[in-house]
Amino acid sequence: MKIDLNADLGEGCASDAELLTLVSSANIACGFHAGDAQTMQACVREAIKNGVAIGAHPSFPDRENFGRSAMQLPPETVFAQTLYQIGALAAITRAQGGVMCHVKPHGMLYNQAAKEAQLADAIARAVYACDPALILVGLAGSELIRAGERYGLVTREEVFADRGYQADGSLVPRSQPGALIENEEQALAQTLEMVQYGRVKSITGEWAMVTAQTVCLHGDGEHALAFARRLRATFAEKGIVVAA
């Protein structure tokens, strides 16, 4: 069994360099919620050095709230902003001799695109316009995955090690209790359940079916590195290969 392990990087966390030795894919902030040209260059350089797949992590234009504010923007605006961010990282990657592999939206852009078909379509269209060979990463079973499939993109369905799930397979909003799993044992057990059996227990106790093709590790958690190491070790024990 194989699983991709991804992390959001270039967002100002001191653990970026070490996380790049533990993950197989990096989602690099493109300036709209965090990061700038210099951090993008640095992350790309480290990702290439570690053989990690490089991806763009576009966001709503919301540096003040780290891309976590809901926005209602016209689809054409979202298309242009997404294309702008993807294109910037693609150029930086190409200039360093690398190849950009995937795109994963950030924060509220990701969450809204999981449920809003027009927004999902704008993102998928931007990815396709930039490079039809790019992989589109989105929440398992979401509108974003369906939009990517309509454009003929390769999609990658994502699950979260440290996030609570609702009965419909969506994430518990960060503003609600149960959104974040702080207990390491619980996060490990949830991740293995999703990867091995394709299901997750919701905060209300029901099982939700999920397709786990990539697992997100949040690099900004207090124990992010320790958890990443433990998850890698657990995967190794279970014979699960980590690869993009």
Curated annotation (Swiss-Prot):
Pfam families, alphabetized: LamB_YcsF
E.C. no: 3.5.2.9
GO-annotated biological processes: carbohydrate metabolic process
SUPFAM superfamilies, A to Z: Glycoside hydrolase/deacetylase
Class of the enzyme per the UniProt entry, highest EC level: hydrolase
GO MF assignments: 5-oxoprolinase (ATP-hydrolyzing) activity; ATP binding
Keyword entries, A-Z: ATP-binding, Hydrolase, Nucleotide-binding
Family matches, as InterPro entries: Glyco_hydro/deAcase_b/a-brl, LamB/YcsF/PxpA-like
Domain of life: Bacteria
Catalytic activity: 5-oxo-L-proline + ATP + 2 H2O = L-glutamate + ADP + phosphate + H(+)
Family listed: Belongs to the LamB/PxpA family.
Subunit structure: Forms a complex composed of PxpA, PxpB and PxpC.
Biological function: Catalyzes the cleavage of 5-oxoproline to form L-glutamate coupled to the hydrolysis of ATP to ADP and inorganic phosphate.
Protein name (Swiss-Prot/TrEMBL): 5-oxoprolinase subunit A
Organism: Escherichia coli O1:K1 / APEC
Top-level taxonomy: Bacteria, Pseudomonadati, Pseudomonadota, Gammaproteobacteria, Enterobacterales
